[in-house]
């Protein structure tokens, strides 16, 4: 991969987008961004607070702006929020400006990876986490599939192993 094209990681919460993104950026010597962290940095508040105050729609509006700005950069790895694909504008931007990699995981692995995480606003409800994750998968998985250039199952692999798999895929391009 002579030219450093943008790499965008999409997938559900708990798929490993941020962890794998950091690994990938280190191995490829590319700059790493996490859209959720960027929103937190710009607002000075955590994602849960933004959700509480502005609602999901307000958060998603911020997300569109951040994704638009970040994807204009060259040679970056971007870990997106799990719901970023809900907005057609984000899907179009991601598809047009880089290589989109769908990090796929099972509901069981998501439950395991997120069980102690209190920073995920969609899991802070009276509905069981399994039900929430199943509903999100039903809504979002087709959207991930729609824009993915590649799909990688992350369940039984380390972040480093997934990063190497991605690099191998990119070298074949």
Curated annotation (Swiss-Prot):
GO terms for biological process: amino acid biosynthetic process; aromatic amino acid family biosynthetic process; chorismate biosynthetic process. The gene is aroK. Catalyzes the specific phosphorylation of the 3-hydroxyl group of shikimic acid using ATP as a cosubstrate. Binds 1 Mg(2+) ion per subunit. GO terms for molecular function: ATP binding; magnesium ion binding; shikimate kinase activity. It comes from the Bacteria. Substrate binds at residues 36, 60, 82, 140. It is found in: Cytoplasm. This is Shikimate kinase. Mg(2+) binds at residue 18. It catalyses: shikimate + ATP = 3-phosphoshikimate + ADP + H(+). PANTHER family: SHIKIMATE KINASE, SHIKIMATE KINASE 1, CHLOROPLASTIC. Keywords: Amino-acid biosynthesis, Aromatic amino acid biosynthesis, ATP-binding, Cytoplasm, Kinase, Magnesium, Metal-binding, Nucleotide-binding, Transferase. ATP binds at residues 14-19, 120, 157. Belongs to the shikimate kinase family. Pathway: Metabolic intermediate biosynthesis; chorismate biosynthesis; chorismate from D-erythrose 4-phosphate and phosphoenolpyruvate: step 5/7. Its cofactor is Mg(2+). InterPro entries: P-loop_NTPase, Shikimate/glucono_kinase, Shikimate_kinase/TSH1, Shikimate_kinase_CS.
